[in-house]
Amino acid sequence: MENNLKTYYRDCLFGALGAMLMFVGDLCLSVIPASQTDSGLFLREAYLNGSWGDWRLPLLLATGLCGMALGFFTIRALYMQINAQYRKTRLAILIGGVIYIASAGVVHFLIGSLADWTNKLSPLLGREETISLIQSQYERLMPAMLIAYAGMLLVILGNAFAVVTKKTFLPRWMIVFHMVVSELLLIIIPDIRQALGAEISTWDFVLSQGSGNAALCIWMLANAVWAHKQQKMGEVK
């Protein structure tokens, strides 16, 4: 078990790093001046006025590729969490993980590239035509991208179910750090702010667009801390 904990601890750290790199890509998209007319993924004033920096898409791509490569360690850690006798649950996590690693990076780059095209085309074609063109392209391609979201849901919900039903070696209280909990909290903060009458801010877009990767990073770091404490307790014994 000690050797498994060392591997698990390392995998969780690498997984957290991978999620952090993916989050950098989310920041490339969301850390821009907010306008009260901003909405959705691409109807952002900073995109439409051509001020979105040319360096952002290459950075999003580079960090995304590295982050998805490190996603291998995330999936292996989630697989290792589940006790060996629960083979079907392990298989579900593995299948969802393979789909996630193979396809989530494509979605990441698709969103980034459409933001970049919005930035490039708006000064040439005008706002209304650019918005219509980009939205049509997004609606045309996203149905094909649903396979990525299917993989993500299988991993996230399957892992949450395994933790709650004690199919993992983790204590049940660890669910408070789970991706489901963190992501829901991050997503509802902008909604709560707007319900209270606050103006739209850059932070609203950061929290909503980066919630998934931030939540994964929190979950991986929480698991790394737990595994490290277990190792220390084993050394004391």
What kind of feature is each model-predicted range?
Residues 2-236:
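Hydrophobic, aromatic-enriched alpha-helical segments typical of multi-pass transmembrane helices
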